[in-house]
Amino acid sequence: AAWAAHKYLMHGPLWFLHADHHTKEPGFFEKNDYFFLIFAIPSWLCIMLGMMYGVSESVAFGLGIAAYGFTYFLVHEIFIHQRFRFLQRSNSPYWNAVRLKHKLHHKSLTKDGAEHFGLLWVPLDWIRAQKKKA
């Protein structure tokens, strides 16, 4: 779901929010940061309404969105883009491959032509290549 949202929404009709993420603009915040609200609000509503009305599937769905959001924040914002200065180095072939794949995604500065939309999935041969570099 996250892969499809990134490829077909963020690199599609919502590019006006995502574009500044592919170019380095001055300042700490990006329009891309609005996606936090776009995903956090439905997550919160699913959890809250699910608890109020006893719909466990709604709570589970909301918690799933929240868990992905937390993972995204740690991996994408902290580890990959270094928006906060910790988790800067890694000796892990997997995490180095994740960082490389994301760097290749950012080679495209337009909404068309980008590749590698997933956050955590990396082909095994990429991990092996990073292992050889270590």
How should these model regions be labeled?
Residues 61-62:
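Hydrophobic alpha-helical transmembrane segments
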